[in-house]
Amino acid sequence: MGDVEKGKKIFVQKCAQCHTVEKGGKHKTGPNLHGLFGRKTGQAPGFSYTDANKNKGITWGEATLMEYLENPKKYIPGTKMIFAGIKKSAERADLIAYLKKATKE
């Protein structure tokens, strides 16, 4: 399990420009991530997803996020997420630990 505080810093630096995490948060360039864990790809209400995201058909969890966040465009070819990914697995684990906490508060 990763470090929530380190994960928050990673989120602020690499994700917050396009995503929010709080309940009722606005969609930005990317969708609000509240309720992410256990949700299928391309399903945040009110966000316009690519067909690639809608049709991927996986459920977000620690394992799927670990793989996706390493290289989003490889995991979901055709996604409009322009983020290159996080190569270090420890940093991905920290980010996932933060997301797990922040997206259900």
UniProtKB/Swiss-Prot annotation:
<dbReference type="GO" id="GO:0005829">
    <property type="term" value="C:cytosol"/>
</dbReference>
<feature type="modified residue" description="N6-acetyllysine">
    <location>
        <position position="100"/>
    </location>
</feature>
<comment type="function">
    <text>Plays a role in apoptosis. Suppression of the anti-apoptotic members or activation of the pro-apoptotic members of the Bcl-2 family leads to altered mitochondrial membrane permeability resulting in release of cytochrome c into the cytosol. Binding of cytochrome c to Apaf-1 triggers the activation of caspase-9, which then accelerates apoptosis by activating other caspases.</text>
</comment>
<feature type="modified residue" description="N6-succinyllysine">
    <location>
        <position position="56"/>
    </location>
</feature>
<keyword id="KW-0408">Iron</keyword>
<keyword id="KW-0479">Metal-binding</keyword>
<keyword id="KW-0249">Electron transport</keyword>
<keyword id="KW-0813">Transport</keyword>
<feature type="binding site" description="covalent">
    <location>
        <position position="15"/>
    </location>
    <ligand>
        <name>heme c</name>
    </ligand>
</feature>
<dbReference type="GO" id="GO:0046872">
    <property type="term" value="F:metal ion binding"/>
</dbReference>
<dbReference type="GO" id="GO:0005758">
    <property type="term" value="C:mitochondrial intermembrane space"/>
</dbReference>
<keyword id="KW-0597">Phosphoprotein</keyword>
<feature type="modified residue" description="N-acetylglycine">
    <location>
        <position position="2"/>
    </location>
</feature>
<protein>
    <recommendedName>
        <fullName>Cytochrome c</fullName>
    </recommendedName>
</protein>
<feature type="binding site" description="axial binding residue">
    <location>
        <position position="19"/>
    </location>
    <ligand>
        <name>heme c</name>
    </ligand>
</feature>
<feature type="binding site" description="axial binding residue">
    <location>
        <position position="81"/>
    </location>
    <ligand>
        <name>heme c</name>
    </ligand>
</feature>
<dbReference type="Pfam" id="PF00034">
    <property type="entry name" value="Cytochrom_C"/>
</dbReference>
<keyword id="KW-0349">Heme</keyword>
<feature type="modified residue" description="Phosphotyrosine">
    <location>
        <position position="49"/>
    </location>
</feature>
<feature type="modified residue" description="N6-succinyllysine; alternate">
    <location>
        <position position="73"/>
    </location>
</feature>
<comment type="function">
    <text>Electron carrier protein. The oxidized form of the cytochrome c heme group can accept an electron from the heme group of the cytochrome c1 subunit of cytochrome reductase. Cytochrome c then transfers this electron to the cytochrome oxidase complex, the final protein carrier in the mitochondrial electron-transport chain.</text>
</comment>
<feature type="binding site" description="covalent">
    <location>
        <position position="18"/>
    </location>
    <ligand>
        <name>heme c</name>
    </ligand>
</feature>
<comment type="similarity">
    <text>Belongs to the cytochrome c family.</text>
</comment>
<keyword id="KW-0679">Respiratory chain</keyword>
<dbReference type="GO" id="GO:0020037">
    <property type="term" value="F:heme binding"/>
</dbReference>
<keyword id="KW-0007">Acetylation</keyword>
<dbReference type="InterPro" id="IPR002327">
    <property type="entry name" value="Cyt_c_1A/1B"/>
</dbReference>
<dbReference type="GO" id="GO:0006915">
    <property type="term" value="P:apoptotic process"/>
</dbReference>
<dbReference type="InterPro" id="IPR009056">
    <property type="entry name" value="Cyt_c-like_dom"/>
</dbReference>
<dbReference type="GO" id="GO:0009055">
    <property type="term" value="F:electron transfer activity"/>
</dbReference>
<keyword id="KW-0053">Apoptosis</keyword>
<keyword id="KW-0496">Mitochondrion</keyword>
<feature type="modified residue" description="N6-acetyllysine; alternate">
    <location>
        <position position="73"/>
    </location>
</feature>
<feature type="modified residue" description="Phosphotyrosine">
    <location>
        <position position="98"/>
    </location>
</feature>
<dbReference type="InterPro" id="IPR036909">
    <property type="entry name" value="Cyt_c-like_dom_sf"/>
</dbReference>
